[in-house]
Swiss-Prot record:
Protein name: DNA topoisomerase 1 type prokaryotic
Domain Topo IA-type catalytic: 124-610
Gene: TOP1P
Organism: Acanthamoeba polyphaga mimivirus (APMV)
One record GO biological process: DNA topological change
Gene Ontology MF, one: metal ion binding
Domain Toprim, first and last residues per copy: 2-110
Lineage, broadest ranks: Viruses, Varidnaviria, Bamfordvirae, Nucleocytoviricota, Megaviricetes
Biased amino acid composition, Low complexity: 814-834
Interaction with DNA as annotated region, ranges: 158-163
Assigned keywords, A-Z: DNA-binding, Isomerase, Magnesium, Metal-binding, Topoisomerase, Virion
GO CC field: virion component
Residues given in the record as Mg(2+) binding sites: E8, D79
Residues at the site labelled Interaction with DNA: H32, R134, R135, D138, Y143, R304, R505
């Protein structure tokens, strides 16, 4: 009997062929090979919204039909989710096999494949309908709304049923951050920490605001010593530090309590994406591609799932590994409950297919596959282990001055020491956390002796650091997936494409957020060689409040599109509406609801709005506002474009534009603000017949000259930039230019420049306004390169991007300390810091700043 197995992806062919042997022919459909015609709506409205498909990969279909000749049985073995079921249906519709069965497996192992063959069935029409409904809903939303966007805003704009809501989520977060900063821009306080006998401690303030009562004084929360609105705003914290100078520190109480920490469930798609991002910095796309390879290699189960269940076979294998590797005392069968409504579609969590394979080192060479497999193995094994037992010791430390004088507010230090009594699952794996700062004040693996109540402890240091209220963090790819999952928007198979799409459409971007510079003050007392030094040191520092790396932020275009959609289609961008639609699709997948009814209801709500808007003109009402005129009589206005809010100045027949940036808005900007924004580009004069323009970018000042940009190096003060300094910068860069080539690459004309840089010779090429640098091999002479050699150099995939931003690099200044001391012979003496503020102390040193991020 001749049998043909049709897979979804070619990466599985080799593994499955090796399992089944020569009697089976194994081919792949290369994913979806038919789709809706992109040039048409491709929906039959007279036939219950039935999609009208076209074959998009005719060569694939031709090859599969050829493979079917002389075949007795065809197994449709696409993946076991909605998309896979739709591909299986497409294979049946297009190839029309006379004898077929639907083959489903979630792991590429011999046992899984043979079991799937034994239990082969039919195509699940409910899953097919659920995928069909999603595809039709997405097409209706995109093809009905996108033309309105293009007509009203301009450009090749498009809307997406899930993508547009995802953009809204990101914009809502950005607005939340802006509102927080506007409300709390200057809200700061001092947070005090200390180290006593080697253990970390945090200052606490008593909740008791009544007259001092020793019985209730030590019931409090982490202290935040506020600044005072006066000539000496830090006096409150300074007075606290002075009292610490005069104090001794005693153990008020020691309390032990036992707690347990339970393991996390095995991975779903979204939790794997989040953890790989936190631990390895992997993008969700990279994570899924790596997991796909592991699945195709037979190392893990299917990677698109929102189930946390493990099969009976999996439990059996995991139990053996735990008892063999760690002992029977560590094993505990844990059953986890699925949260997702449609998790019945994916039968198992992501786990190793052969947990006895502890590592892939020596099996494969790909470092990412090795790392990701280890992570999946650890999480899976840990999920079936006993909870960790941890002894938490809470130590309260009294400050003698506050006890003796019965001061209010009453302060004391509290230390938390965690000792692992039984590691349990933590012997294998500990889940990462999004905010490591929450763990910073806990002393772990403490080896010192726990002091007794009433004993005196050695103060090693006390640090009072000014802190600003931190805005909520922006979304990373992983945390956005988590948010989508929490809201019930999208499914495991859609997360990657959703985020990819809104980035490609330039509605959002992944970027580094520079943060807002804030000057802070730090006071410290340090004890050296266990001697109590009666001195308070003052440092100044500069933090970058809200600085974040690789976060998703909306673009001006995304904000403009979102504003339009929120104005005219608010129901369709509502979180609950979109989540309810996902739930309805889940009901379709189980046969509880009919897909046509869901699409009809959606269409009946959307079509009247589209029809009404299509009749109207000028929906995007002009937001232009006349601000006034500059000194030369040029009219200046503030307006909104598809790229965001701008100010513009009319000079003759042309307009000069400048972006309106935070904290300014279209409504709050004034004429004086606009004049400053429009100050650049500034014409410094001409050099060799071309204008030299001073430009101001996101990273500082730079020059534009003869269609090229030039860095100004360390110069960041516009007052220091004139035509002479500009010419020097231009000539300095040109001195490094060895040769220029006008080439043709893939039918397109490009310009290549041979340069001598800081790290050696390289070729710089600009494609689509993006510069890329290619190192020149050492065996080539950079002064005598041919066009063919240049083309060969720039065809190498490995590149490095030019890292220096326009305007040059920023200088980070180093800190020093100002010392204030409390002498033993007198109660107070005078001291000053470099800013001429006076504090108690005996000496002062020059204070400078450093920049850190927060």
């Amino acid at each position: 009997m001749s049998i043909l197995i049709l897979l979804e992806s070619p990466g599985k062919i080799s593994k499955i062929s090796s399992i089944l042997g020569k009697n089976y022919v194994v081919k792949a459909s290369m994913g979806h090979f038919r789709d809706l015609d992109p040039k048409k709506m491709s929906i039959d409205f007279d036939n219950d919204f039935e999609p009208v498909y076209i074959v998009t990969k005719p060569d694939v279909v031709k090859n599969l039909k050829s493979a079917m000749k002389n075949i007795d049985l065809v197994y449709l073995a696409a993946d076991e989710d909605r998309e896979g079921e739709a591909i299986a249906q497409s294979l049946y519709d297009v190839l029309k096999p006379s004898n077929y069965k639907r083959l489903r497996f979630n792991a590429i192992t011999k046992d899984a494949i043979m079991s799937a063959i034994k239990n082969a069935g039919d195509i699940d029409k409910n899953l097919v309908d659920a995928q069909k409904a999603r595809r039709v809903l997405d097409r209706l939303f995109g093809y009905l709304i996108s033309p309105i966007l293009q007509r009203q805003i301009g450009g090749k704009l498009s809307a997406g049923r899930v993508q547009s809501v995802t953009v809204r989520i990101i914009i809502d977060k950005e607005n939340e951050i802006k509102n927080f900063i506007n409300k709390n821009a200057d809200s700061s306080y001092f947070k005090v920490s200390g180290t006593f006998n080697g253990a970390k401690a945090t200052l606490h303030e008593s909740n008791d605001k009544k007259p001092f009562d020793l019985e209730t004084a030590y019931k409090g929360k982490t202290a935040q010593i506020a600044l005072i609105n006066s000539e000496n705003p830090n006096s409150k914290v300074v007075n606290f530090m002075k009292r610490c100078l005069k104090s001794q520190f005693f153990i008020h109480s020691v309390e032990d309590k036992m707690t347990t920490r339970s393991p996390a469930p095995p991975f779903t798609t979204s939790t794997l994406q989040q953890e790989a991002n936190r631990k390895f910095g992997m993008s969700i796309d990279s994570t899924m591609k790596t997991a796909q390879k592991l699945y195709e290699g037979g190392y893990i189960t299917y990677m698109r799932t929102d189930s946390v269940e493990i099969s009976a076979e999996g439990h059996r294998d995991i139990k053996k590994i735990i008892t063999d590797q760690y002992g029977a005392d560590y094993y505990q069968k844990n059953l986890y409950k699925n949260k997702a409504a449609n998790s019945q579609e994916a039968h198992e969590a992501i786990r190793p297919t052969h947990p006895e394979l502890l590592t892939l080192e020596g099996e494969i060479e790909d470092a990412y596959q090795i790392k990701l497999y280890k992570l999946i193995w650890q999480r899976t094994i840990a999920s079936q282990m006993k909870p960790a037992k941890i002894k938490v010791t809470i130590i309260q430390i009294s400050i003698s001055k506050y006890v003796e004088d019965k001061l209010n507010p009453f302060y004391y230090f509290q230390s938390q020491i965690e000792t692992v009594v039984f590691p349990g699952f933590m012997k294998v794996y500990v889940e990462s956390i999004d905010d490591p700062d929450t763990d910073n004040q806990i002393t772990k693996n403490f080896t010192g002796k726990i002091p007794t109540v009433g004993s005196k402890v050695t103060m090693e240091e006390i640090i009072a650091r000014q802190e600003y209220m931190r805005p909520p963090p922006r979304y990373s790819e992983a945390s956005l997936v988590k948010k989508l999952e929490e809201l019930g928007i999208g499914r495991p198979s859609t997360y990657v494409n959703t985020i990819k799409t809104i980035i490609n459409r330039e509605y959002v971007k992944i970027t580094d957020v520079p943060g807002i510079k804030k000057d802070i003050t730090i006071y410290s007392i340090k004890s050296e060689n266990k001697k109590h030094i009666m001195e308070v040191y003052e440092d100044t520092d500069t933090i970058l409040l809200g600085k974040e790396n690789k976060k998703i932020v909306p673009t001006n275009l995304g904000i403009t599109v979102n504003d339009f959609l929120m104005k005219y289609f608010p129901e369709f961008l509502d979180y609950k509406f979109t989540a309810n639609m996902e739930t309805d699709l889940d009901y379709v997948s189980t046969g509880t609801k009919n897909w046509v009814d869901i699409v009809q209801d959606f269409y009946d709500k959307l079509k009247p709005i589209v029809d009404e808007l299509s009749k109207q003109k000028g929906l995007s009402q002009s937001s232009e506002r006349l601000l006034g005129e500059d000194n030369d009589g040029n009219e200046i206005t503030a307006t909104k474009t598809k790229f965001g809010p701008v100010v513009r100045k009319k000079i003759g027949d042309k307009y000069v534009y400048a972006k309106i940036k935070d904290p300014l808005t279209l409504d709050t900007i004034k004429l004086s603000d606009a004049i400053k924004l429009l100050e650049y580009p500034k014409n410094l004069g001409q050099y060799k017949g071309f204008d030299v323009l001073l430009q101001k970018g996101d990273y500082g000042f730079y020059l534009s000259y003869n269609k090229e940009n030039f860095s100004l190096g360390e110069i960041d003060d516009p007052e220091d930039i004139n035509l002479d300094t500009a010419i020097k910068a231009i000539e300095a860069k040109k001195a490094n230019n060895i040769a220029e080539f006008n080439l043709t690459e893939n039918g397109k004309k490009i310009k290549a420049i041979v340069l001598n840089g800081k790290y050696g010779y390289y070729v710089q090429v600009t494609r689509n306004r993006i510069k890329k640098n290619y190192p020149i091999p050492k065996d080539l002479d950079p002064n005598n390169l041919t066009e063919q050699q240049i083309l060969s150099i720039i065809s190498v995939k490995k590149t490095y991007k030019k890292s220096a931003p326009k305007g040059g690099s920023k200088t980070i200044r180093k800190p020093s300390q100002t010392k204030y001391s409390q002498t033993k012979s007198t109660k107070s003496t005078k001291s000053t810091k470099s800013t001429n503020k006076k504090f108690v102390g005996k000496s002062a040193k020059k204070t400078t700043k450093k920049t850190t991020k927060k």
